[in-house]
């Protein structure tokens, strides 16, 4: 049976319902935020309510003995951050929930973008004191590319906060999405008294508690808006302000439109405090009702229905050495249709071969369990003998299905890398290629050069530290890294462009021509001016910020 350590089973041992019922109760979503907005805390509280963990632990690097359940790589434990995207499954209120947790620290990776390709919806966590921040904007753009529903949780209302009107206005202007407040905060910081639930027309009063942060219980009281005891409970001033706010919101004429939510045009907004648990469970309950079950997926020449009988899935993440003792490699796959059964034979479309997936796993940080079955919407880990790449399709034998490729996003930081010990070239090449195949870094080479030195590109600078750490600790290769003065890289999209045509391009002297591991040509630029020069002086030149795998 499919289950997680410490959680209820998502599939019972009793007589199984049909596939449709199992698929309909799946909810697969990603949580996105800027660093320190409270994403990890919210994730842990979800797991707490689902019974997947018994106590939520705050993560603050080495100073605390507990680590967040989604942080497992050694470098993550040292720094108290999520470098890789983790997958967690739990059961709550009849739903089987798959959370795709994404790095929330300042330097995230391309892996974060790809994780959003496996989600059916996203929860955007915003710090009430700071509003929309840089990383949120980047991740939001990827969600918009896919038209997936985006739900907003405005966190840290128990701390000094900006006006809720300002926050909603900023979300709409900065991100270009409509907002609909599902609840409304009463005060903030030390004056935070709770929220008004617009659908239930009731006030949920917040009662601060010193030691309640790690438990699932939360001290709160319910009041109707016309309860004579409410002004005394929250204070006359806040009561009058709340009445004015409710009147203003109801009179604004904005209707809640589920269709617009489902197409990523309107974001339901919830206010709360993840650290104190306040507003978390009501948010989870509402979110699960509003967010869709597994969505249809586009494949070449067709749309794949999640309720189709035949199994299909795609690889969206590869993680090597999850267990250092076994030097193993796990491919995370998102099941798109049908039912998966342990030991079933599937076709690896890109590899042109059939294979048995004999040890499928559900993962919860470092905990793993072999599973017997899984359904559309589920994320499972399968052993990768080194044959999978990001975006590969797995399907029922003979179906020749091929999902649309996952984009490779342009890195923003670049470093020239070589091994310090030339006798370890083999380990250097193996390690660099393996880490690149996982998608943690991208490797570029100058035209007609070997792997003696490579250009490593990353989305966030911490990935350089991760790369260096892993090369030294997992592959026993010390590397020398030299920062390069480039800020942009673009794929050349012109079909049939050969090396001779590449040499003839009119470019600035500081623009570098390179190729990726698939032999595709790219240009490295120092600034936007150099990009404009290339486009203006080379008629018909097509440059792209991402490339399909």
Residue ranges of model-derived segments:
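Structural and coupling elements of P-loop NTPases
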Residues: 12-549
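Single conserved hydrophobic/aromatic residue that forms the stacking wall/gate
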Residues: 1-13
